[in-house]
Amino acid sequence: MSRAIESVAVIGTGTMGSGIAAASAAAGCRVLMLDLTEEAVDRALGQIDDEHRHLVDTGTIEDDLGKISGYDWVCEAIVEDLDVKRELFVRLEELRKEGSVISSNTSGIPLRQISEGMPARFLEDVAITHFFNPVRVMKLFELVPGEDTSDEVIDAFASFGANQLQKGVVHAKDTVNFIGNRIGCFFMLSGLHLAKPFLADGMNQETVDAVLSAPVGLPPTGLYGLIDLIGLDVMELVGKNLAVNLPDGDTGHAYTEFPAAEQAMHDRGQLGRKAGGGFARQTKLDDGSRHKETFDLTTQDWRDAQAIDLEGVPSDLGEVLFEDSPAGSLA
């Protein structure tokens, strides 16, 4: 039988879960948003446009998990911890309705690990549905089947992603970090290490971000700005996942841990935008303007953000890679 997705239950209402819920509501679906606390769900409701609020029901995982039985797609979007995910999926499988589809928004944990020991119905109905942050803006939607996932389930997810959510669906294999994050996380984690000599030679972090953005075909956030958006807590979990799952001899093993300065930031809760600042922060002044600051990795202190001067740096990828300059060497 064909599977139609007309309603979506999202478990976990953090940055990604709230984004998936908002996109689904905007597509006209009934949406259920559940998290550990009512406060977390209330914050996430701010992502839902007023015109779509009537489509959204909310609750807590402890009190309202049974509500998922009324939804076509059950989407897990909780913390990147395999044991926690597996524990939740056992509960979800007991409660979801026959004919529903179920997925994880994990950014890189293999589906075979999530599915280990689960019943046949789960194995046939489960997939990875990996969205990218921010969900409303990013077109990429990775769809990863398990060994036993049925074709009709994959077709349902692909159709919903392309037609209702207007995403570009990329079919990926069940390998660590799939496609996007296998490339992107290597860039970010290795970039933290490989930028160190340039910082030591006097290049500031703003210039690192500027070079590692438009000139090399990457988002304007650059390196540090992108990690600020994702969060150092998420990146640390990604690194641990890579350390366990990368093949022996893979170059990525050299970069699965943070450099010392970035690890210290993580340990004191300086995680990024969601924590009030990571590598950068903004403060609203009395006159309404914003004061931008950068956390200097060399001095380990906040300073005023510096203007960027990329005069003479080529904007074409092929040229900047071979530019005889610090910017070219960094790229």
Outline where the language-model segments fall:
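N-terminal glycine-rich phosphate-binding loop for ADP-containing cofactors
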Residues: 1-331
